[in-house]
Amino acid sequence: MYKILCLSLLVAAVAADQVDIKDCANHEIKKVMVPGCKGSEPCVIHRGTAFQLEAVFDANQNSNAAKIEIKATIDGVEIDVPGIDNNLCHFMKCPLVKGQEYDIKYTWNVPRIAPKSENVVVTVKLLGDNGVLACAIATHAKIRD
């Protein structure tokens, strides 16, 4: 009984950081996890702090290089997120092999000048040599101090 309880708590703790996303490609993304965020509850992004993102996806192409593109739509205005390292090979093994699963652990600092908002949509695209590797949209985010 004790082992089942411990296993259940471990599964719940791992699942608690998984974020609901809308796929904007061909369902290559298996899951997205952000510490402190869960499910469809709004994810609070704090200005001037490190933001961590983990994504698991299947490569839909062979690619020597990979890039990440992050855009935020804040109160209806889309902007490129500044200050990101867009070279995914710094965060995962390259080259990519079609059909293989990859796990990215990506961290960047949210600029202090980011506008506060209760209505933020974040779009993350992973790009390979031949176009989009994977794409996800998180529709429940807020930017606060």
Swiss-Prot record:
GO cellular component, one term: extracellular region
Principal place of residence: secreted
Keyword terms of this UniProt record: Allergen, Disulfide bond, Secreted, Signal
SUPFAM superfamilies: E set domains (SSF81296)
Single GO molecular function: sterol binding
Biological process, per Gene Ontology: sterol transport
Signal sequence, start to end: 1-16
Record-annotated disulphide pairs: C24-C135, C37-C43, C89-C94
InterPro entries with a match to the protein in the record: Ig_E-set, ML_dom, NPC2-like
Cellular localisation: Secreted
Family recorded in the similarity comment: Belongs to the NPC2 family.
This protein's name: Mite group 2 allergen Eur m 2
Species annotation: Euroglyphus maynei (Mayne's house dust mite)
Name of the encoding gene: EURM2
